[in-house]
Amino acid sequence: MTRRAVVIGAGHYLPDRIVENAEFEATLDTSDEWIRSRSGIERRHFAAEGETTSHMATRAAEAALKSAGRSADDVDAIVLATSTADLTFPSAATMVQSQLGMTKGFAFDVQAVCAGFVYALSNANALIASGQADRVLVIGAETFSRIMDWTDRSTCVLFGDGAGALLLEAQEGEGTSKDRGILATDLNSDGRYKDLLYVDGGVSTQSTGYLRMQGNQVFRHAVEKLASTAHTALERAGASTDEVDWIVPHQANIRIIQGTAKKMGLPMDKVVVTVQDHGNTSAASIPLALSVGVERGQIKPGDLIVTEAIGGGLAWGAVVLRW
């Protein structure tokens, strides 16, 4: 028998404020058509004043716990993927732990930008596989609206705020690709490309800074690296592309999503797409898409799912799991 990390609950949270593409036309040389044609994005959510990453993460976690029929007392650990924690420290994960009323277990943040949730899932899987935890909340949450340069039309129209969460539970499997739960992971990074996507602020500058991105260069890396990491994870899981029910990719933009599916030889009707409604929510995008995919009735128990993401670093990776 093999100890597996099985998804037993999913939930998400989106701020109330919805910003349509047309709102940017008043302040930028852009248009709804320009944004849609280049990104597939139609709208995004922005956090309200005083609404923080930890607040949104807590709301998503509560939704995941409710869907699983569990309480915060049942959770052993929280792994939170974010690049926009409320403060430099303590971690946003410990803030969520407090807001959920947890007084035991442990919590920590993972920072791999848009690839963060894949890294967080891999960490949570290791905690469960090794017996260090039986139930782990894995959360992706971001408030990228607070690191946007609102004069840069190439970036500020792309990103949104939100949070998504999964509750993983240890269950015994047969050790085959037919098991439920996380079957394989693949993580990668290459710091030579750190200047392609970064924030020009932080402790060393004593400022928050703004997101800076060489979008065309990131795109050049994205499709090749995402397809490659997905294939590697599938191979480690003992599964083939033909067996995949759903790709749930990082929702960066529709061109990367379409390009990766094509490179993998999979049709778009096997891809969960939410970028049109959420924009790029960085580490929150995959758990958001998983939760929405369940709500839509797309993702069902037993489905074989590939999640893949790439972000600043560059960092990229994939997780294969059976729902």
UniProtKB/Swiss-Prot annotation:
It comes from the Bacteria. The keyword Transferase applies. GO terms for cellular component: cytoplasm. The keyword Acyltransferase applies. It is found in: Cytoplasm. GO terms for molecular function: 3-oxoacyl-[acyl-carrier-protein] synthase activity; beta-ketoacyl-acyl-carrier-protein synthase III activity. Its EC number is 2.3.1.180. The active site is at C114, H250, N280. It catalyses: malonyl-[ACP] + acetyl-CoA + H(+) = 3-oxobutanoyl-[ACP] + CO2 + CoA. GO terms for biological process: fatty acid biosynthetic process; secondary metabolite biosynthetic process. Keywords: Acyltransferase, Cytoplasm, Fatty acid biosynthesis, Fatty acid metabolism, Lipid biosynthesis, Lipid metabolism, Multifunctional enzyme, Transferase. Residues 251-255 are annotated as: ACP-binding. InterPro entries: ACP_syn_III_C, ACP_syn_III_N, FabH, Thiolase-like. SUPFAM superfamilies: Thiolase-like (SSF53901). Its main location: cytoplasm. HAMAP family: FabH. The last Arg residue of the ACP-binding site is essential for the weak association between ACP/AcpP and FabH. Belongs to the thiolase-like superfamily. FabH family. Catalyzes the condensation reaction of fatty acid synthesis by the addition to an acyl acceptor of two carbons from malonyl-ACP. Catalyzes the first condensation reaction which initiates fatty acid synthesis and may therefore play a role in governing the total rate of fatty acid production. Possesses both acetoacetyl-ACP synthase and acetyl transacylase activities. Its substrate specificity determines the biosynthesis of branched-chain and/or straight-chain of fatty acids. Homodimer. This is Beta-ketoacyl-[acyl-carrier-protein] synthase III.
